[in-house]
Amino acid sequence: MAHSTAGDRDPEVGSEQHSSIAQLHTESMSDPWGDSNSPENPLNWPAPKKNFHVAIVSIFTLTANLAATMFAPGAPQLAKEFNITNSTVEAMTVSLYVLGFAFGPLLLAPLSELYGRLIIYNACNAVYIAFTVGCAFSTNVSMFLVFRFLCGCAASGPMSIGGGTVADITPQEERGKAMALFAMGPLLGPVLGPIIGGYVSQYTNWRWTFRIILIMSGIIGLATMFFMRETNAAVLLRRKAKRSPKDAEGMELELDKTKKETPSQVLVRAITRPFKMLLFSPIVLLISLYTGVLFGLIFLLFTTFPTVFQGVYGFDEGTSGLAYLGLGIGMFLGLVVFSILSDKLLGQKQGGTVSKPEQRLILMKWFGPITPLGCFMYGWSAYHHVHWIVPILGTSIIGFGSLFVVIPGQIYLVDSFGAEAAASALAANLLVRSPFGAFLGLVAAPLYDRLSLGWGNSVLGFITLAFTPVPWLFYRYGETLRTRFVVKL
């Protein structure tokens, strides 16, 4: 029975929630799958099949985040075409998409835990394609803003439930690499977007950025529709019970629980999950705030790059776009280090005993504190007109450190709540993180006008420095907090 569900792989999940699947294992004498090695159980899938599903959701997430900033270089063209003179409205043509990341998961993540991941992936992709077409053929700014926001809501689907898919098919001790690949989308996508979008806008126009996104989304959508399979264990077991009366007898606990609630009650309970997690779990709240600050910092830096590398260092428009690669290289190096160390450290710390989610915070403790150093290096080197390689190295340090906050933070939430509630935990994280990405960039101009690049980035460095004790706190007291502040889902 060790391979029956993700809940079995997550010993700490029981302290967080009353999982129907966990109840099934402890209270029923029979394995709900009929066989602990059943091929129907996603945890028992062959490695190539698991890797394919991780790759698809990771590419889906990367594409969704590419679209967040790929349009940004073309925003001035849209502003000119639609006669936009208000700088805030122009900024909203980019930021509203990211704001959609906060609202979409509130419905999509709970629905995936009730009705399955696959139907949400397919529905989100179809809706996303439709709204992307709307963006590409918009005839006025109001039409564009509405479609842009709705695109963000649809794009949030894979970001909020992808972690659930990873948890569905990978045991805890193998989850680090898979989650690292999945979590790279929100980090690397916004970095690569402006580079690609800059050349697309330069040689075509802003509408072509959406046509390229449309092509990419169509390919991913077809792959999802024809090759992906459902991974949610609870949904698969319910379907199994409906197919076979014999299986239904072994699932009486789960079925009886479901029958006590109407569909609307089940949906309301599921939708309120992310809010309950934020309100009653200090772990979810502080991890979400920490990742939100880092996510917002990255988007804020994007607004300064044209000013710094064109205004201070004299880069042309095309070359200045390559400055974004500093962040990207730092994140890529961080990904390599994380992939090598994450699961290895978990195994070493386990030492034959029960592993704990807090062991995922070790790398955050080690590398998170270097992010403020990158802020200071970037800001003051640009302020004093030091050679351009120095501020780019500063952004690389920011990218490296940010990765070791965002990815371990997400894995910690997934390991803490298990496959049954991973999507809701990540939805809570997105609910906090996305507004930082959407709106923090709007304060860049007044911040730097008043404080200069040096002190402005120092303020950002001090803010990130204030959050560095968070992983140390949870590494020491996380298990106690999870036991004391139990979120009844």
Curated annotation (Swiss-Prot):
Give glycosylation sites per the record: 83, 86
Record key words, sorted: Cell membrane, Glycoprotein, Membrane, Transmembrane, Transmembrane helix, Transport, Virulence
Q: Which InterPro entries match?
A: MFS (IPR011701), MFS_dom (IPR020846), MFS_trans_sf (IPR036259)
> What does the entry say induces or represses the expression of this protein?
Expression is regulated by the Yap1 transcription activator, the Hog1 and Fus3 mitogen-activated protein (MAP) kinases, the two component histidine kinase, and the Skn7 response regulator.
Q: Indicate where this protein resides in the cell.
A: Cell membrane
The way it spans or sits in the membrane comes to: Multi-pass membrane protein
Comp. bias intervals (Basic and acidic residues):
1-12
The UniProt family comment states: Belongs to the major facilitator superfamily.
Q: What protein does this entry describe?
A: MFS-type transporter MFS19
